[in-house]
Amino acid sequence: LKSRSLLPLAIFTLLLGCNASSPDEKLNNSLPDLSLEQILPKVEANQYCTPEMDSELLLGLGIRLINEDEVLYGAGRTLLASKEIKMARSCLIMAAPRYTTSLCILGSIVGARQNDYDKSEAFNYIAYAAKHNESCAEAGLYDIYSVGKLDHPPNKELAMGWLERAARHGDQESQQDMVRWSSEQDNFPVAYAWARVLNEAKTIEAVKRKMSPRQMAEGEQHYTQLLSQLTPEKDIEQALRKDLIALSSGDLYYSHPEVFEGMSPMQRHAFVAQLVDMLDLYPKFHTRGQVVAYALISRLVQSTGPAVDLWQDPALHALLIDDDLSVEDTVTKAKTILAKRKQ
């Protein structure tokens, strides 16, 4: 589990194209016009996911199952879909009607396993998500059109259009690619503008050294124009928080479903949201193991209701920041501490 600033996925965007002649609308028109019902196959419940579950938990479980596949078989094993990948696919398909984010992940795992799934299935997932301004899917289309993938030939114009759109919608890797690509084309004003967006001092200085005063003025002007087109930082943060809550919910449910016993989906969301927000409050609270241990101990302290702020308890705090303890050891020692207090 990583802090939200390190998540790979920067997923929440706003529609910027307002008329048929806008660049965004032209990009949308280059994609198949398919509904969600047309692209989502029918799937059955599995041992982890059912259609009755809420989408937040379904998304989190899908991601956790993908991680489990990597642990069991290695990240490079993509020729065949494992049992875990097949279950993850079903979970993510169930989540898709409310979580367009899941389509980015679906496109990735399906597109990498072409012995089991059609290339068109993967492309349609990515295309639908990109039309709905998911920056992860827009970046995916840049990758597809850059080299030619999923039965689509290389197309430099489309590739660069999707790259620039993903960058505007907050995908940091795409923003870095805009700096690199613009610099390679000697388009230093554009490179400078994107370096300013990234707010990386070394990158800004590296580009500035290659620029004339006139180019600097053009770069500042382009940067000012970009500011009005970028997805607001607060919206990106809210979306990342939402994704991290889903990820943490699925992770906890997969490994320790007892954490959520007796909770409604709304109560579970509030419980996990508190854990996620503590990642920002306490710098030493940042590992997956800490989150799992925290959730388990919190339920020991208070069986119902919101998560308790264990960081205010010196003895429990000391346990949680002890890197030498496993989750199981941390919880066992916490039980001992709590039992002594009841005597």
Describe these PLM feature segments:
Residues 203-244, 331-339:
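Terminal, low-structured helical/coil segments at or just beyond the last alpha-helical repeat
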Residues 161, 165, 186-203, 223-228:
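TPR/TPR-like (Sel1-like) alpha-helical repeat modules
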Residues 46, 51-54, 58, 65-68, ...:
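Short helix-capping/linker turns of helical repeat alpha-solenoids
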Residues 67-77, 107, 111-116, 142-153, ...:
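Short coil/turn linking the two alpha-helices of tandem helical-hairpin repeats
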Residues 80-90, 115-125, 152-162, 187-190:
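Structural signature of tandem alpha-helical TPR/SEL1-like repeats
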Residues 16-17:
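C-terminal motif of bacterial Sec signal peptides marking the signal peptidase cleavage site
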Residues 230-310:
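A contiguous, surface-oriented mixed alpha/beta subdomain in the mid-to-C-terminal portion of proteins
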